[in-house]
């Protein structure tokens, strides 16, 4: 004992004289104390050594060494090596952290006396390791070339409920995976709110549930690197409060449920916490920059799903979003759910960005909103390529687009239609460039109203290309208003533009190609009317449907027995040798025509003919004041009304 006391006195004298760092190792934990911070070391009863309020049991000390390493306050280093891990704790945290390291598994509990943010740097590799941290103050987790697999539970589990900054060291690749059949919520689980930054790469695989889970919000900073979800039994990313992406690259594939799911945070009784108590609890997706790519394959899965609103813009950086859902439907009695590339239980706002959204599963939708959809800008491609799902309670027949529903007098009990863009609320388009396609049902549909004042909107669908409908077929309403922009609506077997309420054209361009027979280019319900006060209109289909009321701009249409046809090229509206406009023909087409233009006059004769050679500035299939060459074919005369 006397020799031990002499040793510690000599050690203290040495580090003070030489300005070195003393490292006290107990098991897999090393406590580093610079000479200028050591102060008095108190040796008590031959069994304890106290340094800076940290008391060591001498029997538990494996080694004390001196070196010239620099010690950074408030920074803990965890280095994994095979089935082991070494934890280095700085002098100022020795009495504030409870550290346990068992082989490759590390647990650190912060004392509630901690007043400054602690940084934990994780590096190295382990096939049987984990990191657990809990505390009551915000913290930073730095991943510096970490490969970590926990065969039993989460690879990283942060129970600290405050802000957690997750830093991906520039240029590093970090890979996390967890075990199968566990009870963990995710491979990487964070109780607090997570903010990801740093230009590194993070790969996560969730073998029990989600890949990433956050009880509170997840935010990717503008300088964030690459975040790859390589697989998950559940969701790729599952968070509460909100998801915000200001930059970085997020790739999600191989998941068993949704790509990203954002929910409202709930209390211990599973009740949603109101905004008055938690201003962050919006259930919202905010994408202000960066790249997001997600593919989901499960039945009824959504590539991006929010219980709250979805807002997409380029406020922070260029935004590129590619979402794909390939799964079919899930059915429970009369409750049916389909897949979607983008789904909001609230509303969707798109101000900017390039979005490519695809649904290929049965009954799938590219965009599905329980509320409104507003598009002010950006470039949107939305495709529903799957078939419709339907079953009937009795009778024969089956669903067919454009056929008005179920054949054989059957009653529909369960169905899900594959649609390009669908909203229960109002669809408002003020700008942007849209290309929407539906292989087997409506392209752009609102269950309330559609308002278009700008942008270019191209829609191709087997059923109605653009449809507004509120209520059942006997009492349906739903107004469609076009006051600007260029709308090109092409239905292969039903109506191009279909308003079950009133249709108002006040400006812009409205082009509509409809099916044959009873289908029309522009369809107005017989109980309502079309009002034309401006704009350029071209509609062609099996007939001209509906009535006209309150029109202040001249219009005209051909009779049911007078048809305009074209194998290719353009339909051109002319008054003598003056060409008013030209409309590109999507395919070989023949039908009854409805036209209107500010240049038309009541009682004046006009012609519509097919030309193969037309020049001029073309926008979404429309050319104003075109130049034509060659001979006209299939000319039809109409009179302005």
Where are these regions (language model features)?
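Sec/Tat signal peptide C-region and signal peptidase I cleavage site
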Residues: 14-19
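Compositionally biased alpha-helical segments
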Residues: 20-70
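Generic alpha-helical secondary structure signal
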Residues: 11-12, 47, 84, 610
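Sec-dependent N-terminal signal peptides
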Residues: 3-13
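A composition-driven surface/loop motif
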Residues: 67-641
């Amino acid at each position: 004992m006397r020799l031990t006391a002499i040793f510690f006195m000599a050690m203290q004298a040495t580090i003070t004289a030489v300005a070195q760092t003393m490292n006290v190792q107990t098991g897999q934990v090393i406590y580093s104390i610079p000479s200028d911070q050591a102060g008095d070391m108190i040796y008590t009863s031959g069994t304890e050594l106290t340094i800076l309020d940290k008391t060591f049991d001498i029997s538990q000390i494996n080694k004390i060494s001196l070196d010239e390493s620099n010690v950074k306050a408030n920074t803990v280093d965890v280095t994994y090596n095979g089935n082991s891990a070494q934890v280095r704790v700085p002098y100022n945290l020795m009495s504030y952290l409870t550290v346990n390291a068992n082989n490759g598994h590390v647990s650190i509990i912060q004392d509630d006396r901690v007043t400054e943010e602690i940084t934990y740097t994780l590096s190295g590799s382990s096939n049987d390791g984990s990191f657990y941290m809990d505390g009551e103050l915000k913290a930073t987790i730095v991943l510096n070339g970490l490969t970590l697999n926990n065969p039993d539970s989460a690879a990283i589990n942060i129970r600290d409920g405050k802000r957690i900054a997750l830093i991906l060291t520039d240029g590093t690749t970090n890979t996390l995976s967890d075990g199968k059949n566990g009870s963990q919520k995710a491979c990487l689980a964070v109780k607090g709110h997570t903010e990801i930054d740093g230009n590194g790469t993070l790969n996560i695989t969730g073998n029990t549930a989600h890949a990433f889970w956050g009880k509170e919000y997840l935010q990717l900073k503008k300088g964030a690197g690459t975040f790859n979800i390589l697989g998950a039994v559940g969701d790729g990313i599952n968070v509460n409060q909100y998801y915000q992406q200001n930059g970085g690259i997020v790739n999600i594939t191989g998941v068993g449920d949704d790509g990203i799911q954002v929910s409202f945070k709930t209390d211990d009784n599973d009740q949603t916490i109101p905004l008055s108590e938690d201003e962050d609890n919006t259930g919202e997706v905010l994408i202000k920059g960066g790249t997001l790519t997600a593919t989901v394959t499960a039945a009824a899965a959504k590539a991006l799903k929010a219980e709250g609103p979805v807002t997409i813009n380029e406020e922070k950086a260029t935004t590129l979003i590619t979402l794909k859902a390939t799964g079919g439907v899930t059915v429970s009695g009369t409750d049916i759910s389909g897949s979607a590339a983008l789904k909001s239980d609230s509303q969707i706002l798109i101000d900017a960005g390039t979005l490519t959204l695809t649904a290929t599963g049965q009954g799938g939708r590219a965009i599905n909103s329980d509320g409104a959809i507003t598009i002010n800008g950006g470039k949107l491609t939305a495709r529903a390529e799957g078939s419709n799902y339907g079953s009937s309670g009795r009778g024969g027949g089956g669903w067919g687009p454009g056929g008005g529903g179920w054949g054989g007098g059957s009653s529909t009990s369960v169905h899900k239609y594959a649609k390009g863009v669908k909203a229960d609320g109002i669809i408002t388009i003020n700008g942007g460039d849209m290309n929407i396609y539906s292989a087997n049902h409506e392209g752009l549909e609102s269950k309330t109203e559609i308002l278009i004042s700008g942008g270019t909107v191209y829609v191709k669908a087997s059923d109605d290309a653009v449809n507004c409908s509120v209520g059942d077929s006997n009492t349906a309403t739903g107004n469609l208003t076009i006051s600007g922009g260029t709308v090109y609506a092409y239905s292969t077997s039903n109506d191009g533009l279909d308003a079950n309420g009133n249709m108002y054209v006040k400006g812009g361009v409205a082009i509509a190609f409809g099916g044959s027979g009873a289908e029309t280019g522009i369809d107005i319900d017989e109980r309502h009317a079309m009002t034309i006060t401006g704009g350029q209109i071209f509609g062609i289909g099996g007939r001209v449907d509906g009535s006209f009321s309150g029109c202040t701009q001249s219009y005209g249409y051909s009779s049911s027995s007078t048809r305009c046809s074209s194998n290719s090229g353009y339909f051109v509206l002319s008054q003598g040798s003056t060409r008013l406009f030209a409309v590109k023909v999507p395919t070989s087409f023949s039908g009854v025509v409805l036209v209107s233009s500010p240049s038309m006059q009541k009682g004046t004769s006009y012609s519509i003919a097919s030309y193969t050679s037309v020049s001029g500035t073309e926008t979404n299939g429309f050319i104003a004041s075109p130049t034509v060459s060659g001979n006209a074919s299939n000319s039809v005369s109409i009179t302005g009304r």
